[in-house]
């Protein structure tokens, strides 16, 4: 999941180089990206993959000033981790499908600036094409306004053993929030995945008074 940090660095460096070359308004286009870093593996259907993809979506939102488009590769089947798995006339959504559904269903209108302060971790081994990383935040986030002017915050927790407690502060003076709708996707283990008879990794919503 920490590989998102590498991809965000590549995007920022690429756009900076292109814009310095004489086109300050140049935008990047992500023509295709996959739902995980290990291709042709059951892991593409797990909660682990959903955490990775939530991080990718947050990264894309934070960088909308640099991106003209972002396309996901193959929504249905196509490889073991297709977002929608179809077989013998039946279909179910992977954990990543439900994450994408949450984001797309939020009906976003505007991306807000956000600063996320979180403990970090480092990796010591190369995984696929991702070399060891340092300073990867456990908590990742993005903030937006929806069509009704409501603030929408997307937050993910990369820690496998620690819950994340979020403290949200607005820069707007006298900004108050009376209640919040919280929608979560989680499971006991990052290796958990949906199956045709048991699609249990789905969004769960509740209201909270502040």
Kindly give the residue locations of the regions a language model identified.
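Short, well-ordered amphipathic alpha-helices
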Residues: 10-18, 56-57, 165-170, 182
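C-terminal catalytic subdomain
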Residues: 87, 92, 103, 136-142, ...
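Aromatic/acidic polysaccharide-binding cleft in carbohydrate-active enzymes
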Residues: 29-140
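C-terminal beta-sandwich/jelly-roll accessory domains of carbohydrate-active enzymes
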Residues: 122-136, 156-210
């Amino acid at each position: 999941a920490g590989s998102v940090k590498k991809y965000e660095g590549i995007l920022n460096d690429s756009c900076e180089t292109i814009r310095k070359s004489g086109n300050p308004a140049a935008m990047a286009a992500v023509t295709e990206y996959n739902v995980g870093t290990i291709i042709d593996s059951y892991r593409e259907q797990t909660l682990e993959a959903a955490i990775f993809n939530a991080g990718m979506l947050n990264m894309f939102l934070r960088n909308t000033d640099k991106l003209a488009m972002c396309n996901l590769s193959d929504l249905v089947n196509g490889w073991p981790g297709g977002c929608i798995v179809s077989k013998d006339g039946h279909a179910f959504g992977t954990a990543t499908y439900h994450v994408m559904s949450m984001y797309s269903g939020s009906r976003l209108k505007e991306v807000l600036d956000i600063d996320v302060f979180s403990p970090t971790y480092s990796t010591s081994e190369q995984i696929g094409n991702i070399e060891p990383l340092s300073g990867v935040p456990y908590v990742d986030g993005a903030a937006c306004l929806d069509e009704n002017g409501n603030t929408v915050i997307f937050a993910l927790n990369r820690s496998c053993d620690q819950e994340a407690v979020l403290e949200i502060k607005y820069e707007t003076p006298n900004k108050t929030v009376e209640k919040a709708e919280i929608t979560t996707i989680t499971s006991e283990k990052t290796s958990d995945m949906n199956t045709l008879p048991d699609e249990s990794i789905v969004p769960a919503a509740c209201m909270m008074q502040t």
